Amino acid sequence: MLEELIPGVRTLTADDLGIGTRARAEAGHASSAPDAPEIGADHPRVQEIIRLAGIFGGVILSGPPGTSKSFFAAAAAQALANGEKSRYRFVQFHASYQYEDFMLGFTPEEGGFRFKEGPFLKLVLDACEKPDATYVLVIDELSRADVGRVFGEALTYVERSKRELPFNIANGREIKVPSNLIILATMNPFDRGVDEVDAAFERRFAKISMDPNREVLAELLDENGMDEALRDRVLHWFNRINGYARKNPAAAVGHAYFSAATDEESLRDIWDYQLKYLVQRAFRRDENTRTDLETAWDHIFPAALDPEPAPGPGATPGAPSAET
């Protein structure tokens, strides 16, 4: 259904979020979509985004992976557009994303080529036709692309003070960025393109820091039915690594990494296939801290907390047990 409404744009589904409860929804760290979020317009964070969007015309949610950026952008977009799917669009930037994808490109047809409107231009034109309605563009992974090249001449005119001023796009057509178009974007502050994004948007849009949230994680683990003692040990490790992240921001771990955590087995999977690599990368030049975090993770599990039983009479120290 959504694909029919916004052809040519990569849409993102609720399955990407892994939502199922309010806490799980807040923890959704994958790219979000406009499919009935469980956080409503009355959520304080959504209200903050809406308020700032009205002042600046655009809001950037900036934070490490797993901090619910995309989900809150999606929830705010729905609220701003009163749930009308034709009034909001989602795009995801990447390293090869260009002006031709976003604003105006060419598409082949019999006998030559014709201009093809990108998602930004389409939404601009729609918003101009209905100035009393709010339209929203959500850009996921803003810092993954060369934003100056992607926005082109429009970069100047997304600024609130320059809305409604006419300018020409690549085919010579005169357009304007209307005041009723809101731009919401997400970005990872540790991406390579962050400096360019900051330079382009720091005067134009508001920015909200999205940080790892212990309270959201605690609620999420409770909703998942995790044993209280195990949950507390996970929270202790979560605090520990994010404490290190104050000096090494690349080590930040968002609460959404634990969205599927229910028991010891699921925690081991999260470590073996995700967190282990994050810790190794963040502390590849700091073996002491890396070892400390690995040891602290092992102590989440009760078996690591119990002292090794003394060998029985006649047993040879270090010899394998009968069960091995």
Segments the model singles out, each with a brief description of its role:
Residues 1-324:
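C-terminal regulatory/interaction module of P-loop NTP-utilizing enzymes
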